[in-house]
Structure formats: structure tokens, C-alpha cells
Amino acid sequence: SALPARSEMCIRDRHCFSSPLKVAEEALERGYVLSFAGNVTFKRNAELRQAAAKAPAGQLLVETDAPYMTPEPYRGQRNEPALIGHTYECIARVRHQTVQALAAEVNDTFDRVYGLR
């Protein structure tokens, strides 16, 4: 398994998640938070979008991974925080949410996971 066996990890955030759907399902079952970057927007990453769609509220984050993982339609260029809206739009679409609802959900998850509340 690609997941650490130790269940006492403090922060269970799978940064820049890019593993197969089966790993996503196992990680979610174990209580991990999956963090998605611009690679979720790549045409060939339908399985990654499925993982984002399956992540329940409270187990999903969105990140830039700048200067890497630039979202479509800017793939191949240097990534920067200003482009994160494309990643949010892609994930919101597959989750059947508005971008605003997804952003609020991600904000709540971030605050909880990183102890800001």
C-alpha cells in the first residue's frame, strides 16, 4: 500500500494527490484528506476527477502546487496562485457544486485539518 501504516499521524493530508482511484478510496476510508492540484484538470486524468468527486465534505482540499501542476488551459506554463480558480471550477463541476460552495467546504476543511479553529 502507498499509505503509511501508522494511524497516529497528526496531519493526514495527501498533498498533490495523483494516485489511482483505488488508493483514493483506501485513503478516504482511513480518514485521509486528499488535496488536489492543477493536474486534476488534465484531460487524461478522468480517474483523478473521480477521486475528487468521491471525497466527502471534510476530506478534500485544493492547492496550487505552484510553480508546478499548472491547470488547463495554461498547462506547460509556470503555475501561480492566480490560476487556482481553474482547479476549483473543474472540481466543483465533477462534484455538482458551485465554486463558492466548494471554496467554503475547502476553507472549513483547511481550518480543521491545520488547527485554525
Per-region residue spans from a language model:
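Active-site glycine- and acidic-residue-rich loops that bind
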Residues: 34-50
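Catalytic beta/alpha-barrel core
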Residues: 12-18, 36-40
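Histidine/lysine/aspartate-rich catalytic loop segments that bind and position anionic ligands
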Residues: 15-23, 28
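Mid-to-C-terminal alpha-helical segments outside catalytic/metal-binding sites
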Residues: 82-117
